[in-house]
């Protein structure tokens, strides 16, 4: 035993992996995949037949779930791909700060203050207008691979 103090930093994911492996041939449309290090939703999958010297290949066309950018990848169908753990959580909107951060109410009564307003113009104006009108708003937050972003809005009526 030493007399030194050991610092322990608590992490929310407790060391859990941000992705899990899945065989390329089993990933379907509307599933998720990691392409170029980004979590994506698959919008199109096509497979090519086995060639003279190789495997059948899967061609994935996917949209980055946070930026909306289109990405493509070609992987042998027998190989494993990384699939992100994607979670959706609903929070009640409490406040919008001057600097573009939102204050959200979690299920256990705590506040979550580390999220920015979304960059999508339509969603942004819906949130700002609804909040200005004093409506009770619930935002849906998508999280994957250590990133979080507001991606939907629900109006639960006037306060």
Swiss-Prot record:
<dbReference type="GO" id="GO:0006414">
    <property type="term" value="P:translational elongation"/>
</dbReference>
<dbReference type="GO" id="GO:0045905">
    <property type="term" value="P:positive regulation of translational termination"/>
</dbReference>
<keyword id="KW-0648">Protein biosynthesis</keyword>
<dbReference type="Pfam" id="PF21485">
    <property type="entry name" value="IF5A-like_N"/>
</dbReference>
<dbReference type="InterPro" id="IPR020189">
    <property type="entry name" value="Transl_elong_IF5A_C"/>
</dbReference>
<feature type="region of interest" description="Disordered">
    <location>
        <begin position="1"/>
        <end position="21"/>
    </location>
</feature>
<dbReference type="InterPro" id="IPR001884">
    <property type="entry name" value="IF5A-like"/>
</dbReference>
<dbReference type="InterPro" id="IPR012340">
    <property type="entry name" value="NA-bd_OB-fold"/>
</dbReference>
<dbReference type="GO" id="GO:0003723">
    <property type="term" value="F:RNA binding"/>
</dbReference>
<protein>
    <recommendedName>
        <fullName>Eukaryotic translation initiation factor 5A-3</fullName>
    </recommendedName>
</protein>
<dbReference type="GO" id="GO:0003746">
    <property type="term" value="F:translation elongation factor activity"/>
</dbReference>
<dbReference type="Pfam" id="PF01287">
    <property type="entry name" value="eIF-5a"/>
</dbReference>
<dbReference type="InterPro" id="IPR019769">
    <property type="entry name" value="Trans_elong_IF5A_hypusine_site"/>
</dbReference>
<feature type="modified residue" description="Hypusine">
    <location>
        <position position="52"/>
    </location>
</feature>
<comment type="similarity">
    <text>Belongs to the eIF-5A family.</text>
</comment>
<dbReference type="InterPro" id="IPR048670">
    <property type="entry name" value="IF5A-like_N"/>
</dbReference>
<dbReference type="GO" id="GO:0045901">
    <property type="term" value="P:positive regulation of translational elongation"/>
</dbReference>
<dbReference type="GO" id="GO:0003743">
    <property type="term" value="F:translation initiation factor activity"/>
</dbReference>
<dbReference type="InterPro" id="IPR008991">
    <property type="entry name" value="Translation_prot_SH3-like_sf"/>
</dbReference>
<comment type="function">
    <text>Translation factor that promotes translation elongation and termination, particularly upon ribosome stalling at specific amino acid sequence contexts. Binds between the exit (E) and peptidyl (P) site of the ribosome and promotes rescue of stalled ribosome: specifically required for efficient translation of polyproline-containing peptides as well as other motifs that stall the ribosome. Acts as a ribosome quality control (RQC) cofactor by joining the RQC complex to facilitate peptidyl transfer during CAT tailing step.</text>
</comment>
<feature type="compositionally biased region" description="Basic and acidic residues">
    <location>
        <begin position="1"/>
        <end position="12"/>
    </location>
</feature>
<dbReference type="GO" id="GO:0043022">
    <property type="term" value="F:ribosome binding"/>
</dbReference>
<keyword id="KW-0385">Hypusine</keyword>
<keyword id="KW-0396">Initiation factor</keyword>
<dbReference type="InterPro" id="IPR014722">
    <property type="entry name" value="Rib_uL2_dom2"/>
</dbReference>
């Amino acid at each position: 035993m030493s007399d030194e103090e050991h610092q322990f930093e608590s992490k929310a994911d407790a060391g859990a992996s941000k992705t899990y492996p899945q065989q390329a041939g089993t990933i379907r449309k509307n599933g998720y995949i990691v392409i170029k290090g980004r979590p994506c939703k698959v919008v199109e999958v096509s497979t090519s037949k086995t060639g003279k010297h190789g495997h059948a290949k899967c061609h994935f066309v996917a949209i980055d779930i946070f930026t909306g950018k289109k990405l493509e990848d070609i992987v042998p169908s027998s190989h494993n791909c990384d699939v992100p753990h994607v979670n959706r959580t609903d929070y009640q909107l409490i406040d919008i700060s001057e600097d573009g951060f939102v204050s959200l109410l979690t299920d256990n009564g705590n506040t979550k203050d580390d999220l920015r307003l979304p960059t999508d113009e339509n969603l942004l104006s819906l949130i700002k207008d609804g909040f200005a009108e004093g409506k009770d708003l619930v935002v849906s937050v998508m999280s994957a691979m250590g990133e979080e972003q507001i991606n939907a809005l629900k109006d639960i009526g006037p306060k």
